[in-house]
Amino acid sequence: MLSIIQRVNCAKVVVDNQKVADINKGILALVCVEKEDTQQNFEKMADKIIKYRIFEDDAGKMNLSLVDIDAEIILVPQFTLAADTKKGNRPSFSSGCPPEIAKEKFKEFENIFRRKYNKVQTGIFGADMKVSLTNDGPVTFSFKI
């Protein structure tokens, strides 16, 4: 399981000219599920993102989590994070999870995430999404579980 999280002042996801997710201060998380991912991976990733201290405290130190500041998050499914880029000039997705399985796995991750934290919005799996955000920092982290 892979994720890139970004601390944002605002973010939104639009599909077919319709806004499907819209947050103010919080996290935009690009999430990629892989073939071998299990519920345990989903639990660990959700905990990591929810508890990761990327927001500044009163002293300006990154010491506060999503929960600490009661912020929102958008989970955006992004299979391209699993691309093999080692050879040539075109990404390969041959080792990726088939779309129908990846969709089920992403939904399972989303459900686990929602059980742990309630201020969650999502993009739409498989849709052509227009994602816009205003980075805060920028502060960006990459996770592999």
Curated annotation (Swiss-Prot):
Top-level taxon in the UniProt lineage: Bacteria
Key word Transmembrane helix present: no
Coiled coil ranges: none
BP GO terms, sorted: D-amino acid catabolic process
Location, primary (coarse class): cytoplasm
Self-association state and partner proteins as the record states: Homodimer.
Task performed by this protein: An aminoacyl-tRNA editing enzyme that deacylates mischarged D-aminoacyl-tRNAs. Also deacylates mischarged glycyl-tRNA(Ala), protecting cells against glycine mischarging by AlaRS. Acts via tRNA-based rather than protein-based catalysis; rejects L-amino acids rather than detecting D-amino acids in the active site. By recycling D-aminoacyl-tRNA to D-amino acids and free tRNA molecules, this enzyme counteracts the toxicity associated with the formation of D-aminoacyl-tRNA entities in vivo and helps enforce protein L-homochirality.
Protein name per its UniProtKB record: D-aminoacyl-tRNA deacylase
Source species of the chain: Francisella tularensis subsp. holarctica (strain LVS)
Classification of source organism: Bacteria, Pseudomonadati, Pseudomonadota, Gammaproteobacteria, Thiotrichales
